[in-house]
């Protein structure tokens, strides 16, 4: 297979055929006597018929809903993932919002439990203690004296 003129031995050259309808050139102007049925229909109706493979926007509509409401939900999701729950003020804010939701959903007479004492990170994230544990080698002496729980990190008393 020979390479076309102007192409080096390692270059790939592709011939791309563009439909005449896309170039707005009729078959008479190019001297091509072979006419397609699509071109004949286009001349009869007066409405350009899009060639296959081309996207043609005929009408614009407003979006069905605002994207901003979705962005708010994703921003809150990111906020909860990246929030340091060891900060007591932030923990209280999240706990208060959970208490409000539970109070509206709980039947009368039942008191919702306070969740401020046990805040759990979402299952799709890892706690910092777990990330640090993965980075440290198993023979590290600091790691041996620490128990990692899903709710909180507690250090065992060291014996002297």
Curated annotation (Swiss-Prot):
**Keyword tags:** Phosphoprotein
GO CC terms on record? cytoplasm
Query: Could you tell me which residues carry Phosphoserine?
Result: 3, 97, 121
Claim: Phosphoprotein is one of the keywords in the record:
yes
Basic and acidic residues bias spans: 127-143
Note down the stretches annotated as region Disordered: 95-160
Intrachain disulfide bonds? none
Q: Which InterPro entries match?
A: Dysbindin (IPR007531)
Q: Domain of life of the organism in this record? A: Eukaryota
| Family the UniProt entry places it in | Belongs to the dysbindin family.
| PANTHER family reported for this sequence | DYSBINDIN DOMAIN-CONTAINING PROTEIN 1 (PTHR16294:SF4), DYSTROBREVIN BINDING PROTEIN 1 DYSBINDIN (PTHR16294)
Per its record, how is this protein called by name?
A: Dysbindin domain-containing protein 1
Source organism per entry reads Mus musculus
Q: What is the lineage of its organism?
A: Eukaryota, Metazoa, Chordata, Craniata, Vertebrata
């Amino acid at each position: 297979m020979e390479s076309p003129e102007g192409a080096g031995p390692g270059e790939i050259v592709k011939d791309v055929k563009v439909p005449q309808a896309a170039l707005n050139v009729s078959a008479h102007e190019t001297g091509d006597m072979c006419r397609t049925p699509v071109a004949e229909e286009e001349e009869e109706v007066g409405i350009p018929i899009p060639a296959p493979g081309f996207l043609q926007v005929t009408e614009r509509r407003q979006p069905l809903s605002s994207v901003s409401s979705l962005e708010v939900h994703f921003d809150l999701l990111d906020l909860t993932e990246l929030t340091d729950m060891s900060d007591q003020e932030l923990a209280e804010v999240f706990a208060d919002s959970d208490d409000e939701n539970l109070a509206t959903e709980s039947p009368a007479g039942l008191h919702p439990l306070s969740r401020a004492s046990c805040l759990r990170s979402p299952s799709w994230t890892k706690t910092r203690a777990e990330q640090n544990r993965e980075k440290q080698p198993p023979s590290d002496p600091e790691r041996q004296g620490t128990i990692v729980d899903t709710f909180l990190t507690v250090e065992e008393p060291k014996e002297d």
